[in-house]
């Protein structure tokens, strides 16, 4: 049996320095999207009109109840997929100019 050693094996080292500094600096400039202030109210009104709890709505759109709570409190980072599911479940527009109006 012959054992061979490869040149440079085991020499993988993490280089920090400049790349790490660029990442830290770039994170400060990132602006997260925010919900339109009328969206949480529209979700609450539509859900209450359908006499649904947050838990029931979450089950209907296959999300966690905490997600509904975040959207209704306005603290959620908006996701187009979740907003689309909410629109279909509540039959109310949650994006665009006519927020809170019934879907056609």
Swiss-Prot record:
Q: Does the keyword DNA-binding apply?
A: yes
The record ties this protein, via CDD domains, to: HTH_XRE
Mind telling me which GO cellular component terms the entry cites? nucleus
Q: Which Pfam families does UniProt cross-reference here? A: HTH_3
Q: Which residues bind DNA?
A: 54-73
Provide a Gene Ontology MF annotation, just one: transcription coactivator activity
State the source organism's domain of life.
Eukaryota
Q: What's any GO biological process attached to this entry?
A: positive regulation of transcription by RNA polymerase II
Q: Where is the HTH cro/C1-type domain?
A: 43-97
Keywords attached to this entry? DNA-binding
Paired cysteines (S-S): none
Q: Hey, what's the signal peptide range on this chain?
A: none
Extract the InterPro entries matched here: Cro/C1-type_HTH, Lambda_DNA-bd_dom_sf
PANTHER family in alphabetical order: ENDOTHELIAL DIFFERENTIATION-RELATED FACTOR 1, ENDOTHELIAL DIFFERENTIATION-RELATED FACTOR 1 MULTIPROTEIN BRIDGING FACTOR 1
**Name by which UniProt lists this protein:** Vegetative-specific protein H7
Q: Which organism is it from?
A: Dictyostelium discoideum (Social amoeba)
Q: Identify the coding gene.
A: cinD-1
């Amino acid at each position: 049996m012959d054992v061979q050693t490869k040149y440079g094996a085991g020499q993988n080292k993490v280089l920090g320095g400049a790349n790490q500094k660029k990442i830290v600096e770039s994170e400060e400039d990132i602006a997260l999207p925010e919900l339109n202030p009328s969206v949480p109210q529209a979700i609450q009104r539509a859900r209450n009109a359908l006499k649904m709890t947050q838990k029931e709505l979450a089950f209907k759109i296959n999300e966690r109840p905490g997600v509904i709570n975040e959207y209704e409190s306005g603290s959620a980072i908006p996701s187009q997929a979740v907003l689309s599911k909410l629109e279909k479940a509540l039959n109310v527009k949650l994006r665009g100019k006519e927020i809170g109006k019934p879907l056609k």
